[in-house]
């Protein structure tokens, strides 16, 4: 049985989509137990494996992260993180304030001993539909070469255990594929990664080939990663708008759209973040999953499934025994 702590109040469309996702997850996974934190007046579901805990506070998207975590002790997010810290749950899931959740992860759940800086990891789509693990996408704007090495170690474990990829190809995001390309950060990180035998380092990869299955795990600093992530999201939305505009521009195009509807939907499904769940803060002494703030019920359900799998595969324990002990 895996127990997860869920923040019912976080997200643009909470608590509605959270409750819908929780109910589906409980019905789909007989080995899942959920502790739900939020306003009891807004909870309209009951289940034998659902435990509800009323909270009197809520962290808003506009709240200053660290201040909110310290002052709103009875918020649904803080109490969900505390449940992980106390060992009541193997992980927590929230679609709330990203900065606040990262702060809760750092200050409440805590880092694995030996991990210098946790990294925010996401799974992004590729042309083949396989996807790739990308980190750091915003936990730390600045990074040192040794931090990127740890990200590679953490990302390798995540790709193996959560995504089921044997011997993942781990690459470093750079401005060229040659070993000597890049700035001092990437050059030094390249050297460290090429000397590490705990994962398969495939070298540098350029941003233009990210979606062409260039690697299973791609590592970068949080500043670069966040910009790449937002650029990919924005580009996907813009292409979708261009497709729609073109297909609705004439009767001929509308007929073509009807014929191609199934194929177009398949392409859009490959590009949909909801298929891949949320982002995970790796390197913490517990599983912390951040669902997209604009998540629908399907996306939040995917985030729950992701957190459940992390608990089942004991990735925190593995990271503690490998990355943590190696650097402790």
UniProtKB/Swiss-Prot annotation:
Its main location: cytoplasm. It catalyses: a fatty acyl-[ACP] + phosphate = an acyl phosphate + holo-[ACP]. It comes from the Bacteria. It holds the Pfam family FA_synthesis. SUPFAM superfamilies: Isocitrate/Isopropylmalate dehydrogenase-like (SSF53659). GO terms for cellular component: cytoplasm. Keywords: Cytoplasm, Lipid biosynthesis, Lipid metabolism, Phospholipid biosynthesis, Phospholipid metabolism, Transferase. NCBIfam families: plsX (TIGR00182). Homodimer. Probably interacts with PlsY. PANTHER family: FATTY ACID/PHOSPHOLIPID SYNTHESIS PROTEIN PLSX, PHOSPHATE ACYLTRANSFERASE. This is Phosphate acyltransferase. The lineage of its organism: Bacteria, Bacillati, Bacillota, Bacilli, Bacillales. The gene is plsX.
